[in-house]
Curated annotation (Swiss-Prot):
Annotated gene: CGA
Lineage, highest ranks first: Eukaryota, Metazoa, Chordata, Craniata, Vertebrata
Cellular compartments annotated: Secreted
Glycosylation sites: 80, 106
Predominant location category: secreted
Keywords linked to the UniProt accession: Disulfide bond, Glycoprotein, Hormone, Secreted, Signal
Signal peptide feature range: 1-24
Annotated organism of origin: Cavia porcellus (Guinea pig)
Record's subunit section: Heterodimer. The active hormones thyrotropin, lutropin and follitropin are heterodimers composed of CGA, a common alpha chain described here and a unique beta chain which confers their biological specificity to the hormones: TSHB for thyrotropin, LHB for lutropin and FSHB for follitropin.
Record-given protein name: Glycoprotein hormones alpha chain
Family: Belongs to the glycoprotein hormones subunit alpha family.
Coiled-coil regions, chain positions: none
Disulfide bond positions: 35-59, 38-88, 56-110, 60-112, 87-115
Source domain of life: Eukaryota
Length: 120
């Protein structure tokens, strides 16, 4: 019985070391947890029609925390959880016409800014 405990403890220790090593290399996509950083990514659908079209994609900051009692009193509809977030949006873009008459935005620079779709 003691032999199995030592064996299990050794396996768990090796597993923890391996997981720590994998998380130490954030530049590799297969080891990344969650979402990649905010940056330009080619839109394959619109790029098939000619010149490459880029869009901003990735993650920025977000957090949720309990709403303070003082703030809850001033809310029209009190909520227990308050959240803050910033989204990956285009800092600069150019309007491009593809396939004759379809106008799209070709993003040229990205940054983390206010999430407009969260506003009501």
């Amino acid at each position: 019985m003691d032999y199995y405990r030592k064996y299990t403890a050794a396996i768990l220790a090796i597993l923890c070391v391996c997981l720590h090593d994998l998380q130490s290399f954030p530049d590799r996509e297969y080891t990344m947890q969650g979402c990649p950083e905010c940056k330009l990514k080619e839109n394959k659908l619109f790029s098939m029609l000619g010149d490459p079209i880029y869009q901003c994609a990735g993650c920025c900051f977000s957090q949720a925390y309990p709403t303070p009692a003082r703030s809850k009193k001033t809310m029209l509809v009190p909520k227990n959880i308050t959240s803050e977030a910033s989204c990956c949006v285009a800092k600069a873009f150019t309007k491009v016409t593809v396939k004759g008459n379809v106008r799209v935005e070709n993003h040229t620079e990205c940054h983390c800014s206010t999430c407009y779709y969260h506003k009501s």
